[in-house]
């Protein structure tokens, strides 16, 4: 089962922030993921998943913005 840091998941689930600044929020998510890996909180596989989720969230937010306009 995939277990990711709860603080990181909270950031990932902040839809308003993602839609407001997709690129910036994805960057923050990536930095938080890398920091968690450096601290040893997540392994390499979890880091890869977190980075993929950050990119998926960015793309989702961009699509949401297009459909909201």
Predicted regions and their residues:
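Acidic, Ser/Pro/Thr-rich low-complexity regulatory regions
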Residues: 1-69
């Amino acid at each position: 089962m995939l277990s990711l840091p709860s603080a990181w998941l909270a950031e990932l689930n902040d839809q308003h922030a993602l839609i407001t600044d997709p690129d910036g929020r994805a960057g923050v998510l990536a930095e938080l993921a890398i920091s968690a890996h450096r601290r040893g909180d997540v392994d390499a596989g979890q880091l890869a998943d977190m980075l993929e989720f950050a990119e998926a969230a960015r793309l989702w937010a961009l699509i949401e913005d297009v459909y909201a306009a």
